[in-house]
Amino acid sequence: MLEQIRGPADLQHLSTHQLRELAAEIREFLIHKVAATGGHLGPNLGVVELTLALHRVFDSPHDPIIFDTGHQAYVHKMLTGRAHEFESLRKKGGLSGYPSRSESEHDWVESSHASAALSYADGLAKAFELSGHRNRHVVAVVGDGALTGGMCWEALNNIAASGRPVIIVVNDNGRSYAPTIGGVADHLATLRLQPAYEQALQRGRDALRALPLVGKFAYRVMHSVKAGIKDSLSPQLLFTDLGLKYVGPVDGHDERAVEAALRHARGFGRPVIVHVVTRKGMGYAPAEDDEADQMHSCGVIDPITGQATKVAGPGWTATFSDALIGYARKRRDIVAITAAMPGPTGLTPFGQQFPDRLFDVGIAEQHAMTSAAGLAMGGMHPVVAIYSTFLNRAFDQIMMDVALHRLPVTMVLDRAGITGSDGASHNGMWDLSILGVVPGMRVAAPRDAARLREELGEALDVDDGPTALRFPKGDVGEDIPAIERRGSGLSGVDVLALPASGCNHDVLLIGVGAFAPMALAVARRLADQGIGVTVVDPRWVLPVSDSILELAARHKLVVTCEDNGVNGGVGSAVSAALRRAELDVPCRDVGLPQRFYEHASRGELLADLALTDQDIARRITGWVAALGSGVAEAEIREHLD
């Protein structure tokens, strides 16, 4: 049946029995396709009936359907003509794991970061009204914990006051990655409002107000009594007191019930909350039985057992997790904060060991950072573990609430650099540029597991300002020993390789963090061409160590190699430091060009960007040749470009 669905119009004449058959087929399709490619399985298994109902009630794309945390949009993609592309899900040149404007007119936004859909919906509703398109509805589907984000409540405040026809579907599965935390999660409860009930209620209000002399007074008295009763009985007042209509809760796996609720909501002609209760991982036993996160996201798995087909090696996240627990056993002041991601950021074991020292604040990165500031003011040393890409959301709090007060808060940035298959929104290529402008910020980029443990310990010993550690997704690899360390403390840099015997000190190659192994491979290639290279790991990459400047003064060329955007990264910082020190040594930066990157594997993206050891060695060879020929600096720059 799924093969016959080319678009939402093909759903309109299906019977209840056919819809049930289609839902079962969609789940089977999802399990086998996502098992083969990896992706967000649990969230999509939970929204099958909801998505069918949405596309039967609303006229997409005329009525925009916006998915917050867009990882729950797989079924939407299938129903809008893209089921045949799922073999390529999250692969280079294939189907994105999130809504994509370039794929379909049904995808209005590139949504993947949480809590933004309601603001998009508010803006679209305003635009439609100003354009005279009063017969268009805007639907925002929020869930997977998105309502724990403050941006949702800012948008709700505006939507409620507008009176515009925005339908807000709350996909209440009680979870983000792990179970949803906080008062909002506790507050999603019951009230079933039907249009007929609302119409009768309004007629009663009008009749009461019309009574001679006492009408308005009687209405106020009765309204106060009704409000008091509702306050004691109806948790949904969280929404209705904002001026939003409320429908629900509705069984999210009863397609007809969801469809009826959506049709009622559409008929109100004003902002409405439709509360839909779903089960993450619905219909797939391995997901339903996964207490950690209902298989929120998975790699390639066996579709029968749900088990990974490839055993991963030691990972960066697990290494951090073990190290933090080790330090926390020795120091009671160490606490940890997560923004709804204890599992993905490695904090679940910490919470099991120290349940009173782990704080899950929900999808609320801004609050996480300022709460960390408060903890630090109170004598704790908070560790905020967060994906690099989500750090962007808390910049003001880092600057004004943490750094301004010189508070000892440590930020651990997982998934730094190119992450790959999750696409543009998840590449952690901005953190060095962002943190580089924060006064007093110190940033480390460990090259291996041993350095991660060491640099985490150093960060925890800092008591006069914020620190950050960044590391990529995936396996951590073998430890890389240093030949020597120049300098001490946070200023100490590790020398990993020296020029071969008989070679000049031509190039100082600075390998930042996980790019250190590639820097060593580049040095070996250059040595074969008679180019002498010193490879250093700066360890604490920001601010630039005096030891780096001392080494730079002994070389003809400095090259930085980093897994970050080149604008404002380590290369920019080293160039600026060389100028301040009045060192006339040219510096070239190798990193990520400043643009958004489509989904592909990390290796594929790095190859496309000429960020392999072979490509980098070729570029450095050209730079050294240009320097050796005595060409003017401007001509060298032109040659390099």
From Swiss-Prot:
Q: Which InterPro entries match?
A: Dxylulose-5-P_synthase, THDP-binding, Transketo_C/PFOR_II, Transketolase-like_Pyr-bd, Transketolase_BS, Transketolase_C, Transketolase_CS
Q: What class of enzyme is it?
A: transferase
Sites binding thiamine diphosphate sit at H71, S112, H113, A114, G145, A146, N173, Y284, E365
**GO MF assignments:** 1-deoxy-D-xylulose-5-phosphate synthase activity; magnesium ion binding; thiamine pyrophosphate binding
Name the Gene3D superfamilies on file.
3.40.50.920, 3.40.50.970
Residues holding Mg(2+): D144, N173
Cofactor binding note: Binds 1 Mg(2+) ion per subunit.
Q: Which UniProt keywords apply?
A: Isoprene biosynthesis, Magnesium, Metal-binding, Thiamine biosynthesis, Thiamine pyrophosphate, Transferase
The prosthetic group or cofactor this protein requires is: Mg(2+); thiamine diphosphate
Looking at the UniProt entry, the stretches that span the membrane are none
Per the record, its GO cellular-component terms are: cytosol
Q: What EC designation does it have?
A: 2.2.1.7
Which Pfam families does the entry link to? DXP_synthase_N (PF13292), Transket_pyr (PF02779), Transketolase_C (PF02780)
- Give the reactions, separated by semicolons, that this protein catalyses: D-glyceraldehyde 3-phosphate + pyruvate + H(+) = 1-deoxy-D-xylulose 5-phosphate + CO2
Q: What processes in GO biological process is this protein linked to?
A: 1-deoxy-D-xylulose 5-phosphate biosynthetic process; isopentenyl diphosphate biosynthetic process, methylerythritol 4-phosphate pathway; terpenoid biosynthetic process; thiamine biosynthetic process
Write out the pathway annotation from the protein's UniProt entry.
Metabolic intermediate biosynthesis; 1-deoxy-D-xylulose 5-phosphate biosynthesis; 1-deoxy-D-xylulose 5-phosphate from D-glyceraldehyde 3-phosphate and pyruvate: step 1/1
Give the HAMAP family listed for this entry.
Answer: DXP_synth
Q: How does it assemble?
A: Homodimer.
The family assignment reads:
Belongs to the transketolase family. DXPS subfamily.
Reported function: Catalyzes the acyloin condensation reaction between C atoms 2 and 3 of pyruvate and glyceraldehyde 3-phosphate to yield 1-deoxy-D-xylulose-5-phosphate (DXP).
Record's protein name? 1-deoxy-D-xylulose-5-phosphate synthase
Organism expressing this protein natively: Mycobacterium avium (strain 104)
Q: What is the lineage of its organism?
A: Bacteria, Bacillati, Actinomycetota, Actinomycetes, Mycobacteriales
This protein's gene is called dxs
